[in-house]
Amino acid sequence: MEAIWLYQFRLIVIGDSTVGKSCLIRRFTEGRFAQVSDPTVGVDFFSRLVEIEPGKRIKLQIWDTAGQERFRSITRAYYRNSVGGLLLFDITNRRSFQNVHEWLEETKVHVQPYQIVFVLVGHKCDLDTQRQVTRHEAEKLAAAYGMKYIETSARDAINVEKAFTDLTRDIYELVKRGEITIQEGWEGVKSGFVPNVVHSSEEVIKSERRCLC
């Protein structure tokens, strides 16, 4: 029987507090925008299936992390078991962009010996008139770290699907090439799920009769 999903990828969404991590995830997983969103305390969990090719689905397990310093010791524990991540900054908040380097360095320390595929996300692009970070400098920073760059808006649903699906496809290609593998004790990538098939007693009897012929 065909698998419900081919692989499960665990993703983590990181960045400073108030950059809009929870809003972006809820727009992607629930299709809605929350005008008022309470700060994440520790870590929240979401999931969604994504079809990357016809008939090929990936289950995304998405961890929404708190950006406040007092919760960092909790969120660091989730780095190691993630295979991919969105690193968010707010295009209207230059400080959140300047802190991208710090987030990447922290992740690098705690993810060993595994790797995380990141996409850099400039969020709140609907507020372009208040922009404090140019697209050019964001693209330059992303290139320096070997990341893709994309600008999104949870409020206006701009590039939200693309951010998650592009990241998923990048990870999938690495898995297909054998550069990322399923490993015991690591939750980043898991193999697909095939549901158990319960046969009726009549079907079992017919099968047994065929075997006796």
From Swiss-Prot:
Pfam families: Ras
GO CC entries: cytoplasmic vesicle membrane; Golgi apparatus; neuron projection; plasma membrane
UniProt tissue specificity: Specifically expressed in neuron and neuronal precursors in the brain. Expression is high in all regions of the brain with highest levels observed in the hippocampus.
Modified residues (Cysteine methyl ester): C213
Region Switch-II, residue ranges: 67-83
Modified residues (Phosphoserine): S201
Cofactor (UniProt): Mg(2+)
Positions where lipid (S-geranylgeranyl cysteine) attaches: C211, C213
Region (Switch-I) location: 35-43
Biological process annotations from GO: autophagy; protein transport; Rab protein signal transduction; regulation of autophagy; synapse organization; vesicle-mediated transport
Catalytic activity: GTP + H2O = GDP + phosphate + H(+)
The UniProt record lists the keyword Lipoprotein: yes
Alphabetically ordered keywords of this record: Autophagy, Cell membrane, Cytoplasmic vesicle, Golgi apparatus, GTP-binding, Hydrolase, Lipoprotein, Lysosome, Magnesium, Membrane, Metal-binding, Methylation, Nucleotide-binding, Phosphoprotein, Prenylation, Protein transport, Transport
CDD domains linked: Rab39 (cd04111)
Residues annotated as binding GTP: S17, G20, K21, S22, C23, S37, T40, G67, H123, K124, D126, A154, R155
Single Gene Ontology MF annotation: GTP binding
Binding site for Mg(2+): S22, T40, D64
Regulation: Regulated by guanine nucleotide exchange factors (GEFs) including C9orf72-SMCR8 complex, which promote the exchange of bound GDP for free GTP. Regulated by GTPase activating proteins (GAPs) which increase the GTP hydrolysis activity. Inhibited by GDP dissociation inhibitors (GDIs).
EC number: 3.6.5.2
Cited InterPro entries: P-loop_NTPase, Rab39, Rab_GTPases_membrane_traffic, Small_GTP-bd, Small_GTPase
UniProt main location, coarse: membrane
Subunit-level organization: Interacts (GDP-bound) with C9orf72; C9orf72 in complex with SMCR8 acts as a GEF for RAB39B. Interacts (in GTP-bound form) with PICK1 (via PDZ domain); a PICK1 homodimer may allow simultaneous association of RAB39B and GRIA2 to PICK1 which is involved in GRIA2 trafficking. Interacts with isoform c of RASSF1; the interaction is strong. Interacts with isoform a of RASSF1; the interaction is weak. Interacts with the DLG4/PSD-95. Interacts (GTP-bound) with HOPS complex components VPS39 and VPS41.
Domain notes: Switch I, switch II and the interswitch regions are characteristic of Rab GTPases and mediate the interactions with Rab downstream effectors. The switch regions undergo conformational changes upon nucleotide binding which drive interaction with specific sets of effector proteins, with most effectors only binding to GTP-bound Rab.
UniProt-recorded name of the protein: Ras-related protein Rab-39B
